[in-house]
A protein has these predicted regions:
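Rossmann-like dinucleotide/flavin-binding elements
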Residues: 1-15, 53-65, 74-143
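N-terminal Rossmann-like dinucleotide/flavin-binding domain of flavoprotein oxidoreductases
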Residues: 20-65
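Short, Asp-centered acidic motifs that coordinate Mg2+ and/or phosphate
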Residues: 70
Length: 143
């Protein structure tokens, strides 16, 4: 919208792709339309007046030195490699996590995790990340 109104827009993304948690959601079964929406957004970045910088972290000093009239900060988050998010206050760590073999939903859905045939999905938050990951694993024939 800002570019359509004649403003120069610069979007800075720390990762190599845009989408963050939406991309994870789109990797889950029956959610491919989310990835299609992200692809549409990426095509919008090709419009005149919009510059997209991927793989770029900005420090506060760089933001302060930028000649922008308006800065919108949408920081997102980075998941823990194990996927443990500590939703339950009394669990500072996941018991047994140091033994290894614990993977984040992101690693599972990107097929980076080396899993056996039997898998336990621990969803301490009770949200879409755990359910969607369990669904994807079931579709892969995991028990």
């Amino acid at each position: 919208v800002a570019a359509e109104r004649g403003h120069r827009v610069e979007i800075v993304e720390a990762l190599q792709v845009v989408g963050g948690q939406f991309r994870l959601a789109g990797m889950q079964p029956r959610r491919g339309q989310i990835l299609e929406l992200l692809d549409w957004y990426e095509r919008q970045f090709d419009r005149p007046g919009v510059r997209l910088r991927l793989n770029t972290f900005l420090e506060d000093q760089e933001v302060a030195e930028h000649a922008a009239q308006v800065v919108v900060v949408a920081t997102g988050s980075l998941p823990d490699d194990t996927g443990f998010q500590r939703w339950v206050p009394q669990e500072a760590t996941l018991p047994g996590i140091e033994a290894g073999g614990v993977w984040s939903p992101e690693a599972v859905l990107r097929r980076e995790a080396r899993l056996g045939d039997a898998v336990v999905v621990y969803d301490e938050g009770g949200n879409w990340r755990g359910v969607g990951t369990a669904w994807a694993l079931a579709e892969q024939g995991k028990k």
